[in-house]
């Protein structure tokens, strides 16, 4: 978490970024946090049991029920998707409704390694 916070500060303090680029890169970071730490799941693969990772899920009984129904394929509204950092950072979210997707990671190490080896995705400088 500390590295995510530091990256956010670095984006804000980067003098090469216009305000629009700062917003754009922070939005990518926000999407990353949203789909992993807020609304993520953890499982070795799609055929194993899932555990709730995200605090946004844990804080809502409706969200918990939605995840359970999605895992059991009893719900056509939300899908379970294997984590991919590019997919995650470019996917917007709606905080006012149940989530239409939940990404799952294999492990915290996998998530951290993915984040730390793809920092450039959060440092877009424009065309």
Predicted regions and their residues:
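Core of folded catalytic or high-affinity ligand/protein-binding domains
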Residues: 1-126
């Amino acid at each position: 978490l500390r590295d995510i916070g530091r990256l956010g500060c670095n984006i804000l303090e980067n003098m090469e970024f216009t305000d629009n680029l700062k917003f754009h890169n922070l939005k990518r970071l926000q999407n990353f946090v949203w789909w992993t730490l807020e609304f993520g799941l953890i499982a070795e693969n799609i055929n194993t049991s899932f555990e709730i990772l995200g605090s946004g899920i844990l804080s809502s009984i409706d969200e918990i029920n939605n995840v359970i129904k999605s895992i059991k394929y009893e719900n056509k509204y939300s899908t379970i998707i294997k984590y991919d950092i590019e997919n995650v950072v470019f996917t917007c979210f709606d905080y006012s409704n149940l989530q239409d997707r939940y990404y799952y990671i294999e492990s915290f190490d996998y998530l951290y390694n993915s984040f730390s080896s793809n920092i450039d995705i959060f440092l877009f400088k424009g065309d």
